């Protein structure tokens, strides 16, 4: 499968637009058809140019530009795999702030938010448990390391500024300067102590708009790379993306191309780089390339990068058919990591294929850093943009083989009673994971799970998705409600007729053309007098959303709730049909549904104390006592008044 790379980017208006995802069955286009119809013939023909953008020359950063073995606070990498989405913290350089207003708005409020949102949803990581605090560069690029000390010590002085590519790293993201000035250890830290760092992030991306030498000599929109790697798994934790200011276009027709370019470049920084091949790990966390005592692989000075082993990249010779019925030898480099081999064999239906071929043309930066264009044409990580870039399973496999980014191709929540509801991938319908237990073990090739929560290991072969033609791969699936065998409604949020009955609408949901599926953080509760009701099937629901200059708004009844950032918890408390509905919703990304969104911020503090008017059906004991006391005090007065009249 291939995920749409450039389209489906966000929509204006009060409701959601089309899905951000589209799937196609092929990674490349086999032919080009020029369809000419409905046009008046002219005396002259219109020339058609079939070309490609200039090749991507990914600059593998030099040894002096990258800091390895960066010590992070706490145990930054958890050894077990946890299904959590990649979190990228975007930090904009002052050069972005100095762009023309329309370019600045495009970069900060549309281009990078959409690209980052896409990548965060696509990749998962081993969850970190600490704060990213980057190492300082040294003034002379010379440093020492002490045994059993995770820090590095600059010989002489630390650099006045630490850079990530061309972008200066903010001081608050840096560790304290540590120096060695000769003599005996210990030598200590000097200057400003450790700063705050970056919490709740797996990767920090510094975005600049600097007119660098590369911008003046190469016809490029942007370029990106990594700059610091953590000590445990050699994972890039910081990188940069620089936009050439003169190449930033605000023309709507050029946005899709720029968006696909930014995604392509950020993937280079995350792991698809020849400079990182030697740092790939296997599924157990072991390096695929042997290391020296200092923890680093051998350095290849002729290539200017760390030398990978043949467990990652292998050189092979092909027999090459050319003209005059001749066969020549053709040397290629194959990426041979396990998941890449598996996906390449599936894609080309070739069970003996050794790996996926890397590009061998285009010069330094294009060669070895991309897939072979001849084989994967418009795949996202080929070396030039020709048409409609798509991200294939082969690139996803490579990112998983880095040992850091992982993919979760299926859901793992058992379908049971009560149901644990979720959202369909496009967030347009309530869904349920169709994972179930079968009466007999599934065929070996369809047994996907090494573990499932609450399921004994000996029972795992019995579990898979309910749809056989999907290879028993469980996925979140739309469903319908039935009563006594009769169809009632479906879970598609956009269909008004799916609106639940008033007294069954526990979550205060609203179905209609402007509604989307939102995750419920907690089960909704209906309260009235001393009665409390909740529905056992919960986890998601349909709610109306709208776009505003302030951001995405979620509507429950006639009350709007502003989403300041994705993942924000919205405490909901509304009155509907004489009942109080209480619950919590999770905010989606504004970019999932809106064309323009403001920068994400922390929500303002709110007073969550509920002030409700008195309900006529109230069963408050204090109110009952008060009424009886009032009647008791009035009775003697009334009796005296009647006696006076009698006499």
UniProtKB/Swiss-Prot annotation:
Residues in coiled coil: none
Any one Pfam family match given in the protein's UniProt record, by short name: Peptidase_M8
Name of the protein: Leishmanolysin-like peptidase
Free-text function comment from the UniProt entry: Metalloprotease.
Family: Belongs to the peptidase M8 family.
Residues at which Zn(2+) binds: 264, 268, 370
Active site (catalytic residues): 265
Top EC class, one word: hydrolase
EC number of the protein: 3.4.24.-
GO terms for MF: metal ion binding; metalloendopeptidase activity; peptidase activity
Any one GO cellular component localisation term in the record: focal adhesion
Source species: Homo sapiens
Keywords: Cell cycle, Cell division, Cytoplasm, Hydrolase, Lipid droplet, Metal-binding, Metalloprotease, Mitosis, Protease, Zinc
Disulphide bond pairs: none
Protein location: Cytoplasm; Lipid droplet
InterPro entries recorded: Peptidase_M8
Biological process per Gene Ontology, one example term: cell division
Tissue specificity of this protein: Expressed in all cell lines analyzed.
Cofactor note (record): Binds 1 zinc ion per subunit.
Superkingdom to which the source organism belongs: Eukaryota
Principal place of residence: cytoplasm
Needed co-factor(s): Zn(2+)
